[in-house]
Structure formats: structure tokens, C-alpha cells
A protein has these predicted regions:
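A structural signal for short, well-ordered beta-strand segments and their strand-loop junctions
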Residues: 1-2, 26-27, 70-72
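Beta-sheet repeat architectures centered on beta-propellers
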Residues: 52-67, 73-289
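Surface-exposed ligand/attachment interfaces on beta-rich extracellular proteins
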Residues: 7-11, 16-17, 53, 267-269
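Surface-exposed extracellular loop regions of Gram-negative outer-membrane beta-barrel proteins
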Residues: 25-50
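A short beta-strand motif characteristic of beta-propeller blades
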Residues: 2-8, 45-50
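Generic structural signal for coil-to-beta-strand starts
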Residues: 23, 31, 67-68, 75
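Beta-propeller and closely related beta-sheet repeat lectin domains
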Residues: 14-16, 22, 59, 108
Length: 289
């Protein structure tokens, strides 16, 4: 065993987080340093991989093995070896910057859900007065599909935790009635030694994300169905596994305000009847909880 003392290179502000693993990363407010074990007299080698960008707060950094995700003053990023890659450039960063309650940025927390390959940031939105320290939204990044989503949830903290061993004798601690447990006993959830996403809820109690599904809302990108021509839509067929409500949004010029249809319910044929004409279209689909 060996150790030493070294001064960090550069002037990147306070150290806010340090990640572990085969390679370590030291996050400062305006700098990221890679830490490699090399042994000998040097022991650890420190290399600056981001001289002008760091983490806003330590709790905005999360990790799944060698995949590191963090929120900086200019958006969301992922570390891949020596590369700091933007993952929220343009639309995601703009949305988060406009939706965040900037009076309480210190309450942003991040965690990884390795079971579902998600990097998640819990934050207070502009619609939340946040006087009690409770956040109300999660920004979610699937680092396999590279897709983003938003969830409305009230919590003060999120974190990843190990699932402990579960036996028939211990099930009474969870519930005295097995029929009231809403997680199938056949799922890998009950296997010990796996990491799962946990939270401190709005009542400041430890919780897990095992409840019933929330309402899902999807909106397609804006599309010109027939380039250079108008179109008329009379129905939409959502490919979903439940009943859904659809709103069609249209405009004739990109400078125009968006016009929305009334919400349409799915009929017995799986089609949502609508009647909307225009040049540019997008569909908003809501799937009930």
C-alpha cells in the first residue's frame, strides 16, 4: 500500500466530487482531472481532461462503472476516457435551463439506474416554490438508446442502492399480505446484490420506484408530410399497448403560431379520429396511468 500528496494542476475552483473505479475523476467547479494509478514514486498521475468545464455541484455527478455523467454550467455531458462528450446540446440544455428554478440549483441531485440504463437528474422546476426542499421533476437520459424524457415526481433525493437478500420469512417486513406487493415475485428485482434506484420521498421517507405506471406523454417532431403542399389528417393510429388520447398540432408557416385540435379518444379500431389540415404537423399522444 502506498500514498502521497500532490497539488492539483491548474485553478479550477473547489473540488466538488471524486468518482471511483479503475480510473478516477476529480471534479472541480471549472475543471475535470483524470486520476490514474501508475505505481512507483508517482503513485497517481493527474491529467487535466477539461480545463474550463466542471460540475456545478457534486450531487450533479453520477456514475455507472466507467460511464460518468454530469451537469455543468453549460449543459449535460458524459465522460468517455479522456473525452468529455455533450449529450444535451441544443434542445435538452435549453429546456432544462428554462425549466429549472435557479434559486434552488443546489438541490439538483443525480443518480444512475443501472437496471434500466438511465442517468437521472432530480431538480426543482420553475413551477415549484421549493420552500420545503422537495424537487418535482426528473430529467432522464437513457445512455444506451441516447433518448431523453421528463418525469413529474416529488422527492428530495435520489440514489442507487443494493437490493438485500429476500426470503419468505423476510417478506412480512415488506407486507403482511403477498397480494398487496405490486412487484412480481418472478422478476429479477428480488435478486440480492443488484443496484436499484431509490429516493427520499416528499415525506422524507426512503422509497423505491416500484409503484404503478404514471401517465405517459409523447410528442412527435414536426413534419411536413408532403413537401411543398398542405395535407389533411382525418385519423391517427398510435402503436401503443393501451388506450391513448391524441392531439394534432399544425401550422402553415414556421413563423405561425401552432393550432391544436381537440383531444381525440381511441375508438374500437385503435384509431383516434381527428380532422386537422395544414403544412406542418406533430402529434401529442397521452397514455393514461
Amino acid at each position: 500500500k502506498s500514498s502521497d500528496t500532490q497539488d492539483l494542476p491548474g485553478s479550477g475552483g473547489q473540488v466538488v466530487a471524486i468518482t471511483s473505479g479503475e480510473v478516477g475523476y476529480v471534479f472541480r467547479q471549472d475543471q475535470i482531472i483524470r486520476m490514474d494509478f501508475v505505481g512507483g514514486a508517482t503513485i497517481f498521475r493527474f491529467s487535466v481532461i477539461s480545463p474550463n468545464r466542471g460540475a456545478v455541484f457534486g450531487q450533479t455527478v453520477c456514475q455507472d462503472n466507467r460511464q460518468i455523467f454530469f451537469y455543468a454550467s453549460d449543459g449535460f455531458f458524459q465522460i468517455n476516457g479522456d473525452q468529455v462528450l455533450p449529450i444535451g446540446a441544443e434542445k435538452v440544455n435549453r429546456f432544462f435551463d428554462s425549466d429549472l428554478n435557479k434559486a434552488y440549483t443546489d438541490r439538483i441531485t443525480a443518480a444512475v439506474d443501472p437496471f434500466n440504463t438511465l442517468a437521472i437528474w432530480l431538480y426543482p422546476s420553475k413551477d415549484n416554490p421549493n420552500t420545503t426542499g422537495i424537487c418535482d421533476k426528473m430529467l432522464i437520459y437513457n445512455y444506451v438508446t441516447q433518448k431523453w424524457s421528463v418525469a413529474k415526481i416529488k422527492a428530495s433525493q435520489i440514489f442507487k442502492q443494493f437490493v438485500t437478500i429476500n426470503t419468505v420469512e423476510l417478506m412480512d417486513i415488506i407486507s403482511e399480505n403477498l397480494d398487496e406487493i405490486n412487484i412480481s415475485l418472478d422478476t429479477p428485482y428480488w435478486t440480492s446484490g443488484h443496484l436499484r434506484l431509490g429516493a427520499i420521498d416528499e415525506n422524507f421517507k426512503a422509497a423505491i420506484f416500484s409503484g404503478t405506471n404514471l401517465e405517459a406523454e409523447l410528442e412527435t417532431k414536426e413534419t411536413e408530410l408532403f413537401p411543398g403542399a398542405r395535407a389533411n389528417i382525418t385519423g391517427v393510429r398510435p402503436i401503443v399497448d393501451a388506450s391513448a388520447n391524441v392531439v394534432i398540432k399544425t401550422r402553415n408557416k414556421l413563423a405561425d403560431a401552432v393550432t391544436s385540435s381537440t383531444s381525440s379518444s381511441m375508438n374500437d379500431s385503435g384509431i383516434n379520429p381527428v380532422r386537422q389540415s395544414g403544412r406542418y404537423f406533430r402529434a401529442n399522444v397521452k397514455i393514461p396511468a
